UniProtKB/Swiss-Prot annotation:
TrmE-type G domain span: 218-366
Listed HAMAP family: GTPase_MnmE (MF_00379)
Compartment list: Cytoplasm
Cited function: Exhibits a very high intrinsic GTPase hydrolysis rate. Involved in the addition of a carboxymethylaminomethyl (cmnm) group at the wobble position (U34) of certain tRNAs, forming tRNA-cmnm(5)s(2)U34.
Listed name of the protein: tRNA modification GTPase MnmE
Length: 441
């Protein structure tokens, strides 16, 4: 029996013990399993309290069963849900009983969603939206994932693909009537107009500057500077807990420390880097090398120095802010800054000035992400396939191109959109996408 023909089961809820746990069963034998466990099938889509018993008749638990017959289920197959007490012993006994049924096996990660995809319950962009929703850390990410799960990109891609196929039909009809010049011209004119319109629409989406990808991946802020200027104290204050060792000895931080922040719904990763200085210690040298690499790759660098240090930042990046720390120890002596050099003066130890820095970080994050929720593209896969589709459309509009070549370019464009939706030739990416899901999803 092929694995896709087998009935699968998995725990669909979080770690045990818990108040309740849910086991999900999907496949052709789901009804047989449910009937064997409870004695009968409950009415479809109604929660029914029941005794769950082993095949020997021993009581496993007093639980709740739900029955979703095909095709009206999340996977498109027969699906049963068993709501039990969230005990490790209860779950283990039920899993042992399920494993004893012939043709029934534990599910692989993401296998329930993959079966839903294969049975037409959702397209590949919607499955990716579900994955993003599961992994969302902030409210903005949650909203974007829900839009993707709701089909915001998939619906547009389907519309574009349908219109390309309509234009292709006109082009092929023109080829069939190529001996009758007027008829062929009358068909090719509307086809080219439609192609130009579609090409402009997709180009507009591609010009969104990666807003959706930015929100999915988050913004990176690096804290950099010389040793002993309070970088670890600042990241601890941002994290509101101790994540880095604070020490008066230079070179304490040798590796990069990361924290995840939710700044007004925006996902931000803050990294604390090793103090930048010359050192004979090979371990510290490696830490400094990594610090420079991470700072250069960050979206924003907070260059930390003492309150009296007016030296220029020793890092490069798209955006570098000067942060003068330890103003509580400066005795009123704070270095000045030039007119084009805004400076934040703080005490990471006492919190003085920290609210102003945090407010500007939040403002910068909002500006960085922009109206990300209006973006359609959330993954590199989306951008690559849309770019391929747009390139084929552009090539099809080259003046004087033979109608047969135009038709071939339109087929290639429709094929790229089909790959985006998961309709054609995507077996190579399915394992990667669904493998990120939890077991039981």
């Amino acid at each position: 029996m092929h694995p896709s023909d087998q009935t699968i089961f998995a725990l669909a809820t979080g770690p045990l013990p818990s108040a309740i746990a849910i086991l999900r069963v999907s496949g052709s034998r789901a009804g047989d399993v449910l009937r064997a466990l409870t004695g009968s099938l409950p009415p479809p889509r109604r929660a029914v309290r029941c005794d769950l018993r082993s095949r020997d008749g021993d009581l496993i638990d007093d639980g709740v069963a739900l029955w979703f017959p095909t095709p009206a289920s999340a996977t498109g197959e027969d699906v049963a849900e068993l709501h039990i007490h969230g005990s490790r012993a209860v779950a283990a006994a039920l899993i042992k009983t399920l494993s004893a049924f012939e043709g029934v096996r534990p599910a692989e990660p993401g296998e329930f969603t993959r079966r839903g995809f294969e049975n037409g319950k959702l397209d590949l962009t919607e499955a990716e939206g579900l994955d993003d929703l599961i992994h969302a850390d902030t409210d903005a990410q949650r909203r974007q994932a829900l839009r993707q799960l709701g089909g915001v990109l998939g619906d547009r891609a389907r519309q574009w693909r349908d219109q390309i196929i309509e234009a292709l039909a006109l082009v092929e009809a023109g080829i069939d009537f190529s001996d009758e010049g007027d008829v062929a011209d009358e068909l090719m004119g509307p086809a080219r107009a439609k192609i130009a319109e579609l090409s402009a629409e997709i180009a507009e989406v591609l010009a969104e500057q990666g807003r959706g990808e930015k929100l999915r991946d988050g913004m990176v802020v690096a804290i950099a500077g010389p040793p002993n200027v309070g970088k670890s104290t600042l990241i601890n204050r941002l994290a509101r807990r101790e994540v880095a060792i604070v020490s008066p000895h230079a070179g304490t931080t040798r590796d990069v420390i990361e924290i995840q922040l939710d700044l007004d719904g925006y996902p931000v990763t803050v990294i604390d880097t090793a103090g930048l200085r010359d050192s004979d210690d090979p371990v510290e040298q490696e830490g400094v090398r990594r610090a420079r690499l991470r700072a250069a790759a960050a979206d924003l660098v907070l260059w930390l120095s003492t309150a009296t240090d007016a030296s220029d930042p020793d890092v490069k990046g798209p955006e570098v802010w000067r942060v003068r720390n330890k103003i509580d120890l400066a005795n009123g002596e704070v270095a000045e800054s030039g007119p084009s050099q805004p400076v934040f003066r703080i005490s990471a130890a006492t919190g003085e000035g920290f609210a102003d820095l945090l407010r500007e970080l939040t403002r910068f994050a909002a500006q960085y992400f922009g109206s990300a929720e209006a973006g359609l593209i959330t993954r590199d896969r989306h951008r690559r396939l849309l770019a391929d589709a747009a390139a084929s459309l552009t090539r099809s509009l080259v003046p004087g191109l033979a109608e047969e070549i135009v038709a071939e370019e339109l087929r290639a464009s429709a094929h790229s959109l089909g790959r985006l939706l998961g309709r054609v030739d995507v077996e190579d990416v399915l394992g990667e996408i669904f493998g990120r899901f939890c077991i039981g999803k």
